[in-house]
Amino acid sequence: SVVGEPFTQWVVEDRFLAGRPDWHAVGVEFVGDVEPYERMKLRLLNGAHSTLAYLGYLAGHPTIAAAANDDRLRAVARGVMAESAATLDGPAGVDLERYRESLIARFRNAALPHTTAQVAMDGSQKLPQRLLAPLRARLAAGREVRLLSLAVAGWMRFAMGKDERDRQSHDIAVAVRPHLDSIARRFDASVKVAEIPPGPPV
């Protein structure tokens, strides 16, 4: 048997030189400009996916589905998408609230074997488009970034190679380091991930 999922989204820019192919029957949506759809996917689908990966890993959840079925993390993912959605000029005819709920349903699908560690592992280079872009847009508009900031903090904690139970993952620490170094080179800086000592917040 083949495991599938009900979620589908296939958007194609309507620019064909020899006539448009008849792909409507398989669910293709032809649009004049795919950029709004790409931005929507990056900031909503990918941003929430990364959020669940970082925070889910830190909370000890092995899979994205397990993280999404945690009431608290699901609420955070919804909040991240709500903050990000406010930075979008949504594609015409797209109900962003319905789209966000369809993503939550997809993330909760236990038949999808995506692990939090796998999704989080290559996220450092993707963070600017997924989380930092909407965060900056909200800051520029004078809006709060409480949950987007939490997602970014989750990435920072993940980069230390430890979860919230203080279990060290050498493999993750080693794998994440080259991405941090790559980012540092772009900004002519050096990266040192320092642990925050235990104790009450200051």
Predicted feature residues:
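Substrate/ligand-engaging "lid" and interaction regions
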Residues: 1-202
